[in-house]
From Swiss-Prot:
Residues 378-441 form the TRAM domain. Residues 2-120 form the MTTase N-terminal domain. It is found in: Cytoplasm. Keywords: 4Fe-4S, Cytoplasm, Iron, Iron-sulfur, Metal-binding, S-adenosyl-L-methionine, Transferase, tRNA processing. InterPro entries: Elp3/MiaA/NifB-like_rSAM, Methylthiotransferase, Methylthiotransferase_CS, Methylthiotransferase_N, Methylthiotransferase_N_sf, MiaB_methiolase, rSAM, rSAM_horseshoe. Residues 143-375 form the Radical SAM core domain. Gene3D superfamilies: Methylthiotransferase, N-terminal domain (3.40.50.12160), tm_1862 like domain (3.80.30.20). Binds 2 [4Fe-4S] clusters. One cluster is coordinated with 3 cysteines and an exchangeable S-adenosyl-L-methionine. [4Fe-4S] cluster 1 binds at residues 11, 49, 83. Its cofactor is [4Fe-4S] cluster. GO terms for cellular component: cytosol. It holds the Pfam family Radical_SAM. This is tRNA-2-methylthio-N(6)-dimethylallyladenosine synthase.
Length: 442
């Protein structure tokens, strides 16, 4: 049985793709063994992220560490997948000639054939084309062991924000046909999955073709998935404010399975910076979306992405972001220092903000967000939360870990038969990034 080591960098889309790589290899070889140490593997895969320079360079650092394994075992297969593969292509082979296969997010289904071609010809294989929907036509049926699962409904992005490489590494937006998505979710529900997370670079742009040739938009998809037997909770990742329509907002009013947590990246509270980023909305328009959402879901927890130190960002513009964060009360958000990416329009902008100042802004923004997260956690003490038990706690092997609808991790004492089940937990303690609870007896 082939032993496979895979290291995944970046977003949840990459996590999903890594699972699919393992699935196509398992189908090809009649099963595989996933190992946690590279020196135990027959196949080593790095599924990469190019959103920030640091993540991209780490890939080449990791490749350097496995080079001695290749020298010791020439039959070892080393592969680079994901967005760095799409961006760099043949350059990866030039920089690391011991790499055997390089493939992008849309060609991962071709991995088994690429390995065979490498073994037959002795030549490294590179395939970073964008065949769009073909990938999903060649992936084996989803198999899961947990109570939650990701389902990719669309890929790519056509927004072309000035700082972002995604349209260049994952291609333009394309949506899976409605029936394909529903079949996958129904299959997962039959396997015991309770929670579905609909996945895409911009899920609100979903426009899947229906059997009658009509187009299903994202709000309609949410309503259909809501009625699939066995599915108890629904999430989606990630959205773009420009297409967060009233019909999507109304789903929060009508669909109780849709969790009270939303990740909606804003990036900045400054209209000038948002315009330079080519985001296509203003801070006021973003706040209008949130106002409508909280009018119908007052308990909605909102997380976001922020970039500090974007070229030309002034102290006043950063203060506008800080004020927006306080006004909206963002929770569990992600703050990054701007990282110029080759080939993007923003990479050509003049940047005169010292790195030390960018670090200060990052820390200031994180401080405000973490304070709000801690405040929300404190308000949950004494409440009973419906939670999905994910498995053994990462903090204590004698405890279990569950997740609330608003995306909080709860550690508690339980029994193994609770894993992958929905249970009620009373929250007894709150920390900055997790909660402690106890089982509510029926």
């Amino acid at each position: 049985m082939k032993k496979v080591f895979i290291r995944t960098f970046g977003c949840q889309m990459n996590e999903y793709d890594s699972d699919k790589m393992l699935a196509v290899l398992a189908e090809e070889h009649g099963g595989i063994e996933q190992v946690t140490q590279a020196d135990e593997a027959d196949i080593i895969l790095f599924n990469t992220c190019s959103v920030r320079e640091k993540a991209q360079e780490k890939v080449f650092s990791d490749l350097g560490r496995v080079r001695p394994l290749k020298e010791k075992n020439p039959g070892l297969i080393i592969g680079v997948a994901g967005c760095v593969a799409s961006q760099e292509g043949e350059n990866i082979i030039k920089r690391a000639p011991y790499v055997d296969v390089v493939f992008g997010p849309q060609t991962l289904h071709r991995l088994p054939k690429m390995i065979v071609d490498k073994e037959t010809s002795g030549l490294s294989q590179v395939d970073i084309s964008f065949p769009e929907i073909e990938k999903f036509d060649h992936l084996p049926p989803a198999r899961v062991e947990g109570g939650a699962a990701f389902v990719s409904i669309m890929e790519g992005c056509s927004k072309y924000c000035s700082f972002c490489v995604v349209p260049y590494t994952r291609g333009e937006e394309f949506s899976r046909p409605l029936n394909d998505v529903l079949t996958e979710i129904a299959n997962l529900a039959q396997q015991g999955v309770k929670e579905i997370n609909l996945l895409g670079q911009n899920v609100n742009a979903y426009c899947g073709e229906m059997d009658d040739g009509e187009i299903c938009d994202f709000a309609t998809l949410l309503r259909i998935v809501h009625e699939i037997p066995g599915i108890e909770r629904m999430r989606f990742t990630t959205s773009h404010p420009r297409e967060f329509t009233d019909s999507i907002i109304e789903c929060y009013r009508d669909l109780p399975k849709l969790v009270s947590h939303l990740h909606l990246p804003i990036q900045s509270g400054s209209d000038r910076v948002l315009s330079a980023m080519k985001r296509g909305y203003t801070a006021l328009e973003y706040k209008s979306i949130i106002r409508k959402l909280r009018a119908i879901r007052p308990d909605l927890c909102l997380s976001s992405d922020f970039i500090v130190g974007f070229p030309g960002e002034t102290e006043r513009e950063f203060e506008q972001t800080l004020k927006l964060v306080k006004d909206i009360a963002f929770d569990l958000s992600f703050v990054f220092i701007y990282s110029p990416r080759p080939g993007t329009p923003a990479a050509n902008l003049h940047d005169d903000t010292p790195h030390e100042e960018k670090v200060r802004r990052l820390e200031a923004l994180n401080e405000v967000i973490e304070a709000e997260t801690a405040r929300i956690n404190q308000t949950m003490i004494g409440t009973v939360q419906r939670c999905l038990v994910e498995g053994i706690s990462k903090k204590d092997p004698d405890q279990l870990q569950a997740r609330t609808a608003n995306n909080r991790v709860v550690n508690f004492t339980g029994t193994p038969n609770m894993i992958n089940q929905m249970i009620d937990l009373e929250i007894t303690e709150a920390y900055t990034f997790s909660l402690r609870g106890k089982v509510v007896e029926a």
